[in-house]
């Protein structure tokens, strides 16, 4: 994995564009993330995490986090699109006060999710549990910013 670029670099490159604040779309993304978070929580409490559902849990957790980051960006008039958009969204975590460790974990999550989607990478229960721990820690924090 390459080192994470600064959010301003993504702006300069045109991957992130400044736009009008889009509260309607941001609220929609927050609501969708709430539903997904509740679903992940119910799976975790019900059937639990295992090697068979690890990829699904990781993908859904990633999407939940990214929906909140996108909502926060939209509330501040930013939108990322095209090649590098997901990296730009992860780099935005620094702008909203997340630690370098959290940003690195989110970037690793992005990288592994990409590996699953495009290269057939299989993740295990242990990694999925780490992702759930990360989700449970960052989800409330980002969600509170999006109010």
Regions of interest found by a model, annotated:
Residues 1-147:
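Terminal alpha-helical segments
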């Amino acid at each position: 994995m390459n080192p994470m670029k600064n959010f301003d670099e993504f702006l300069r490159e045109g991957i992130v564009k400044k736009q009008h604040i889009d509260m309607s779309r941001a609220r929609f993304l927050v609501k969708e993330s709430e539903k997904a978070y509740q679903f992940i929580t119910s799976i975790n409490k019900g059937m639990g995490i295992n090697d068979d559902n690890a990829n699904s849990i990781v993908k859904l957790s990633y999407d939940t986090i990214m929906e909140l980051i996108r909502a926060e960006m939209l509330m501040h008039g930013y939108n990322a699109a095209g090649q590098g958009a997901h990296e730009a969204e992860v780099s935005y975590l620094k702008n909203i006060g997340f630690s370098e460790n959290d940003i690195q974990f989110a970037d690793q999550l992005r990288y592994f999710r990409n590996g699953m989607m495009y290269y057939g990478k299989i993740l295990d229960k242990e990694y999925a549990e780490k992702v759930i721990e990360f989700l449970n820690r960052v989800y409330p924090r980002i969600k509170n910013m999006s109010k």
